Regions:
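General structural signal for secondary-structure boundaries
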Residues: 3-4, 72-75, 157-158
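Extracytoplasmic/periplasmic C-terminal soluble domains
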Residues: 142-185
């Protein structure tokens, strides 16, 4: 092969290597961006999906679906009503932990519904919620699971319901928080 042929081959090889490195870096940045955005939900989705590629596609799909939703903050009136409902649920816990935790679950679902999140089923709702509230969604699932679990002694059940109330409170506070406008400079 002539010198010119070797030079052309070297240039083509270099271009291919640079392209492969660029693609790899782009994928790495995309993965890192999803990991940063979704936090623990990223790891949970990878574990559940069985592969990083499948999980990342799922997370990107969630972002796309979320963009097409009309998620709105609560009105001041709705926020006040839900805050009163929440205070009642917390007071109820002393006398009836089971009913209080179920009421807390219902209140959080109501807030999600009023804000425009899908209410088809828990998986659809939590998938949409994970885009805007990736840390709260884990607590929402945990609280929901605690409320709907069975087979515990009365003491264990009360403790599970207490943990559910704590989880729901974190989620509730995040969901009812007024949207803050960015400060103007």
């Amino acid at each position: 092969m002539s010198t010119t042929g070797w030079v052309i081959l070297a240039i083509v090889a270099a271009v291919v290597v640079v392209a492969l490195v660029a693609m790899s870096m782009s994928r790495s940045r995309r993965s890192s961006g999803l990991r940063d955005r979704f936090g623990p939900e990223y790891d949970r989705t990878v574990t559940e999906a069985g592969s990083r590629r499948t999980a990342e596609k799922d997370l990107r799909d969630r972002e796309e679906q979320y963009e097409s939703m009309d998620i709105q903050p609560l009105s001041d009136g709705a926020r006040d009503r839900y805050t009163e409902d929440w205070a009642r649920a917390e007071r109820l816990f002393v006398d009836d932990p089971e009913l209080a935790a179920r009421e807390a679950d219902r209140i959080v679902r109501g807030v999600l519904d009023d804000r425009g999140y899908p209410n088809d089923d828990l998986d659809t709702q939590t998938a949409a919620m994970s885009v805007e509230h990736p840390n709260a969604v884990q607590r929402y699932r945990h609280g929901h699971d605690m409320v709907h679990s069975n087979g515990q002694s009365p003491e264990e059940r009360t403790e599970s319901l207490r943990k559910a109330m704590v989880d729901f409170r974190v989620v509730f506070e995040e969901l009812v928080e007024p949207v803050r406008e960015p400060a103007e400079h």
